[in-house]
Amino acid sequence: MKRLILITDHYPYTRGELPFVQPELAVTCQHFEVSVICKSPAEKQEYPLPPGVKLYHYHKDATVGEKIRNLFGCLLDGNYYRSVFGKEHAKGSWRAREAEVRNFRLSAHLFRKYLRDEGFFDRIEHTIYYSYWYNYGAMALA
């Protein structure tokens, strides 16, 4: 059976993506082996999932070593410079942009490592990865 890996920011720990996810899960569960990976820092699950849906709760704070490695990685990454200084950069001071891009990159790297370590990249030819938002979860899949 094909797998669907759904990456959420809040659901089912808080309301978050509930209006988008709930109507779709009933149908997708009939055709896919569904897993939800929630990145919410909340501890208590507020909303039930349909039977058969596996839930994984991801929340990780970076260690000092990971932050330092990310800083050096940024210095060697052309996309980092384009995001901070390029024509399409976000508004605000360059320091604020730099911190946002650096943290986004670190979060994506740590989440990608989690996905790899937990086996979510096994059987990729039979897996669909889905994120509602363009955030570090989506970037981890890039």
Cite the ranges covered by each PLM segment.
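Serine-centered coil/turn micro-motif
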Residues: R15, D77-G78, N135
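Short N-terminal targeting/anchoring amphipathic segment
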Residues: R95-L106, K113-Y136
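Amphipathic alpha-helical segments that form well-ordered structural scaffolds
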Residues: V27, L110-R116, A140
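N-terminal subdomain of nucleotide-sugar transferases
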Residues: M1-V64, I124
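A conserved catalytic-core segment of Leloir-type glycosyltransferases
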Residues: E43-L106
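Short, flexible coil/linker elements and helix-boundary hinge sites characteristic
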Residues: E33, F85-G86, D117-G119
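Extended hydrophobic/aromatic segments used for targeting, binding, or gating
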Residues: L6, Y136-A142
